[in-house]
């Protein structure tokens, strides 16, 4: 397999490309920008495309994928596409309809990976972020093991080739893994992960269970208000990353991406900028030394850009535990 399409084998036998293209964009970015960016990513060599119902862009991402299939650049089986189940569809009876809705938006027959996006359940309905008249989130109480059983049925129906989770902590992963009658383990846990939050303990736990850790916000974060603290440090300006970038004649972003690949983490790179999209593919062209890796390990300072604290309160809020 050529280096551009390096893959990791998942615990269900499917393969996931280790470098993925993230399609999330802040609200002010026009949704149709996702068409051009996704096409550019596929042309540049990305084969793993990550989106979600929450991002409101699946029809555009699907359009881009289908146009690259139509023009002969790729076949459907070359693309590894991830979607995610949003919190308002955790009740088991809503899981398959939510996936079918994503597939309809995408105009695809299946997704390669379907994830439970976040472990806190919200009130079912059309509203993605349902609130009461005082602006308080409207939560729901759902047993995530029941949600997981509905996810397993989606895999059995062929609507999703693989199933996994996102933003789960160790306790929540164990709850699924220890579920009586478990049919399929989650293939991955997609979490925020970068040199300032390197998730060492969660990574070791996932590896011990043959669950792949997938890193989002691997380059820091989009810094979107109101989600991200505007005073948080900018990862890509870190002196250690900048020094390593200079040493390897690469960008700090490439150093941050390469770091994840070398520790066995699948990494998502989000950019709508053509030059940076192409640049990010160069992560396969160089290697960091063990000293480089140690230096980056030393940057860990437990800085979480996406605390999602509007979801704090319910027992399923994942970020109160150590990991």
From Swiss-Prot:
<dbReference type="GO" id="GO:0008206">
    <property type="term" value="P:bile acid metabolic process"/>
</dbReference>
<feature type="binding site">
    <location>
        <position position="50"/>
    </location>
    <ligand>
        <name>NADP(+)</name>
    </ligand>
</feature>
<comment type="subunit">
    <text>Monomer.</text>
</comment>
<feature type="binding site">
    <location>
        <begin position="166"/>
        <end position="167"/>
    </location>
    <ligand>
        <name>NADP(+)</name>
    </ligand>
</feature>
<dbReference type="GO" id="GO:0047006">
    <property type="term" value="F:17-alpha,20-alpha-dihydroxypregn-4-en-3-one dehydrogenase [NAD(P)+] activity"/>
</dbReference>
<dbReference type="GO" id="GO:0032052">
    <property type="term" value="F:bile acid binding"/>
</dbReference>
<dbReference type="GO" id="GO:0007586">
    <property type="term" value="P:digestion"/>
</dbReference>
<dbReference type="GO" id="GO:0047045">
    <property type="term" value="F:testosterone 17-beta-dehydrogenase (NADP+) activity"/>
</dbReference>
<dbReference type="GO" id="GO:0033703">
    <property type="term" value="F:3-beta-hydroxy-5-beta-steroid dehydrogenase (NADP+) activity"/>
</dbReference>
<feature type="binding site">
    <location>
        <position position="222"/>
    </location>
    <ligand>
        <name>substrate</name>
    </ligand>
</feature>
<dbReference type="GO" id="GO:0031406">
    <property type="term" value="F:carboxylic acid binding"/>
</dbReference>
<dbReference type="GO" id="GO:0004303">
    <property type="term" value="F:estradiol 17-beta-dehydrogenase [NAD(P)+] activity"/>
</dbReference>
<feature type="binding site">
    <location>
        <begin position="20"/>
        <end position="24"/>
    </location>
    <ligand>
        <name>NADP(+)</name>
    </ligand>
</feature>
<comment type="function">
    <text>Cytosolic aldo-keto reductase that catalyzes the NADH and NADPH-dependent reduction of ketosteroids to hydroxysteroids. Most probably acts as a reductase in vivo since the oxidase activity measured in vitro is inhibited by physiological concentrations of NADPH. Displays a broad positional specificity acting on positions 3, 17 and 20 of steroids and regulates the metabolism of hormones like estrogens and androgens. May also reduce conjugated steroids such as 5alpha-dihydrotestosterone sulfate. Displays affinity for bile acids.</text>
</comment>
<keyword id="KW-0443">Lipid metabolism</keyword>
<dbReference type="GO" id="GO:0005829">
    <property type="term" value="C:cytosol"/>
</dbReference>
<comment type="similarity">
    <text>Belongs to the aldo/keto reductase family.</text>
</comment>
<keyword id="KW-0963">Cytoplasm</keyword>
<comment type="pathway">
    <text>Steroid metabolism.</text>
</comment>
<dbReference type="GO" id="GO:0047042">
    <property type="term" value="F:androsterone dehydrogenase (B-specific) activity"/>
</dbReference>
<feature type="binding site">
    <location>
        <position position="117"/>
    </location>
    <ligand>
        <name>substrate</name>
    </ligand>
</feature>
<dbReference type="GO" id="GO:0047115">
    <property type="term" value="F:trans-1,2-dihydrobenzene-1,2-diol dehydrogenase activity"/>
</dbReference>
<dbReference type="InterPro" id="IPR018170">
    <property type="entry name" value="Aldo/ket_reductase_CS"/>
</dbReference>
<feature type="site" description="Important for substrate specificity">
    <location>
        <position position="54"/>
    </location>
</feature>
<keyword id="KW-0521">NADP</keyword>
<dbReference type="GO" id="GO:0047718">
    <property type="term" value="F:indanol dehydrogenase activity"/>
</dbReference>
<feature type="binding site">
    <location>
        <position position="190"/>
    </location>
    <ligand>
        <name>NADP(+)</name>
    </ligand>
</feature>
<feature type="binding site">
    <location>
        <begin position="270"/>
        <end position="280"/>
    </location>
    <ligand>
        <name>NADP(+)</name>
    </ligand>
</feature>
<dbReference type="GO" id="GO:0047044">
    <property type="term" value="F:androstan-3-alpha,17-beta-diol dehydrogenase (NAD+) activity"/>
</dbReference>
<feature type="site" description="Lowers pKa of active site Tyr">
    <location>
        <position position="84"/>
    </location>
</feature>
<feature type="binding site">
    <location>
        <position position="24"/>
    </location>
    <ligand>
        <name>substrate</name>
    </ligand>
</feature>
<dbReference type="InterPro" id="IPR023210">
    <property type="entry name" value="NADP_OxRdtase_dom"/>
</dbReference>
<feature type="binding site">
    <location>
        <position position="227"/>
    </location>
    <ligand>
        <name>substrate</name>
    </ligand>
</feature>
<dbReference type="InterPro" id="IPR044482">
    <property type="entry name" value="AKR1C"/>
</dbReference>
<feature type="active site" description="Proton donor">
    <location>
        <position position="55"/>
    </location>
</feature>
<dbReference type="InterPro" id="IPR036812">
    <property type="entry name" value="NADP_OxRdtase_dom_sf"/>
</dbReference>
<dbReference type="InterPro" id="IPR020471">
    <property type="entry name" value="AKR"/>
</dbReference>
<keyword id="KW-0560">Oxidoreductase</keyword>
<feature type="binding site">
    <location>
        <begin position="216"/>
        <end position="222"/>
    </location>
    <ligand>
        <name>NADP(+)</name>
    </ligand>
</feature>
<dbReference type="Pfam" id="PF00248">
    <property type="entry name" value="Aldo_ket_red"/>
</dbReference>
<protein>
    <recommendedName>
        <fullName>Aldo-keto reductase family 1 member C1</fullName>
        <ecNumber>1.1.1.-</ecNumber>
        <ecNumber>1.1.1.112</ecNumber>
        <ecNumber>1.1.1.209</ecNumber>
        <ecNumber>1.1.1.210</ecNumber>
        <ecNumber>1.1.1.357</ecNumber>
        <ecNumber>1.1.1.51</ecNumber>
        <ecNumber>1.1.1.53</ecNumber>
        <ecNumber>1.1.1.62</ecNumber>
        <ecNumber>1.3.1.20</ecNumber>
        <ecNumber>1.1.1.149</ecNumber>
    </recommendedName>
</protein>
<dbReference type="GO" id="GO:0047024">
    <property type="term" value="F:5-alpha-androstane-3-beta,17-beta-diol dehydrogenase (NADP+) activity"/>
</dbReference>
């Amino acid at each position: 397999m050529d280096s551009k399409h390096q893959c990791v084998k998942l615990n269900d036998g499917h393969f996931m490309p280790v470098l993925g293209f993230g399609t999330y964009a802040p609200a002010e970015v026009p949704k149709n920008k996702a068409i051009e960016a996704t096409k550019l990513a596929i042309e540049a060599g990305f084969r793993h495309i990550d989106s979600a119902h929450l991002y409101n862009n699946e029809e555009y991402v699907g359009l881009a994928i289908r146009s690259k299939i139509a023009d002969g650049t790729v076949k459907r089986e070359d693309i590894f596409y991830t979607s995610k189940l949003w919190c308002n569809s955790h009740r088991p009876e809503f899981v398959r309809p939510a996936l079918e809705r994503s597939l309809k938006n995408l105009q695809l027959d299946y997704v390669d990976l379907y994830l439970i996006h976040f472990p806190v359940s919200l009130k079912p309905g059309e509203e993605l972020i349902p609130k009461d008249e005082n602006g308080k989130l409207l939560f729901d109480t759902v047993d995530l093991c029941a949600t997981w059983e509905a996810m397993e049925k989606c895999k059995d129906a062929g609507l999703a080739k693989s199933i996994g989770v996102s933003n789960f902590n160790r306790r929540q992963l164990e709850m699924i893994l220890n579920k009586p009658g478990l049919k399929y383990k989650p293939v991955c846990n997609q979490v925020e992960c970068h040199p300032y939050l390197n998730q060492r303990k969660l990574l070791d736990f996932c590896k011990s269970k043959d669950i792949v850790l997938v890193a989002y916000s691997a380059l820091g974060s989009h810094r979107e208000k109101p989600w991200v603290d505007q005073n948080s440090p900018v990862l890509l300006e870190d002196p250690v990353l900048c020094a390593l970038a200079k040493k390897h004649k690469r960008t700090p972003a490439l150093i941050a991406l390469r770091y994840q690949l070398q520790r066995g983490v699948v990494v998502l790179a989000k950019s709508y900028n053509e030059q940076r999209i192409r640049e990010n593919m160069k992560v396969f062209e160089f290697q960091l030394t063990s000293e480089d890796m140690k230096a980056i390990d030393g940057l860990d300072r437990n800085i979480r850009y996406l605390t999602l604290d509007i979801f704090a309160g319910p027992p399923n809020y994942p970020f109160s535990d150590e990991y």
